[in-house]
Every structure is written in C-alpha cells, then in structure tokens.
Design a protein with these regions (language model features):
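Short catalytic/metal-binding and nucleic-acid-binding patches
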Residues: 1-146
Length: 146
C-alpha cells in the first residue's frame, strides 16, 4: 500500500527537514554544501518556490519555504535524488543517503515564522559549527529582518 500524498497550500510556509540516513553526514567538504545550495537554487527557481532561510548542518538540512503548492514533493525528490547520486559517486558508496521521507511542518503564524527563522539561523551556532553558519547568498530571494 502506498503512502498518502501530502497536501500543501500555495499560500502556506513550510519548515522542511531532511536527515542523513542513520544520522550519517550529508556534507564532508564545502564543495558538497555549495553543490547542494546550487541545486536548491536551481530547483526552487524551476518550480517557482520561495526560500526564506536554510541551514546545512553536517547530518541534516533545514529549509523554510513558501509558495510550494504541489511542487514541494517534486522539489525534495529532485534535490534528494540528484544530491544522493552526486554524493554516492564522489564518495564511492551506494544506498540511501537520506533517512526516509522528509519532514515538513506548517508555519501558520507570523510569530511561528519568526521562531522557526531564528531556530534555523541559530542552529549551527548552538551546535558550535561556525564553519557552516546559515549562509545568506544568492539563493535567498527574500529575507526576514526583525
């Protein structure tokens, strides 16, 4: 029996979390992170999805997105598949890179939007991972300013 399709609303904002399988690292080098970011940018532009913030931790990723509609599943599928193929080829491995299905939470208020944005930005700082701080580069079409 297949899984139920997720229902999304175009006007809604979502906090998406993608985890490494068995808590394994998703990124070993900055070049891995840059490739993931370039692909995120490519697919969000292609599918007309807004990215408000994101954070690449060693073994998981946070992305705050809007205008997802039915394209959020397509975005994650394209992103996860293409990155896993790159990663497996580069590091001479096989099998699943990501742990099961991605998680997504509806961000249903301005206050929660602020809370999630703060969490995403502070996540690497709290984990003492200064080298992978939330990167505010060309992918951010919009940013939230207090």
């Amino acid at each position: 029996m297949g899984r139920k399709a997720r229902l999304y609303c175009e006007s809604q904002v979502y906090h998406v979390i993608m985890r490494g399988n068995n808590k394994q690292n998703l990124f070993y080098e900055d070049s891995d992170r840059y490739l993931f970011i370039r692909r995120l940018k490519k697919y969000t532009e292609e599918l007309q999805i807004d990215v408000y913030s994101y954070c690449l931790m060693s073994n998981h990723v946070h992305i705050l997105i809007g205008k997802a509609n039915m394209n959020m599943s397509k975005l994650i599928q394209k992103l996860a598949t293409s990155y896993a193929m790159y990663f497996n080829r580069k590091y001479e491995r096989s099998g699943h890179l990501f742990q099961g299905r991605y998680k997504s939470e509806t961000v249903d208020s301005d206050e929660y939007f602020k809370t999630v944005t703060r969490y995403i930005i502070q996540n690497p700082i709290k984990a003492n991972l200064e080298d992978i701080r939330n990167r505010k580069d060309e992918i951010l079409k919009k940013s939230y300013e207090d």
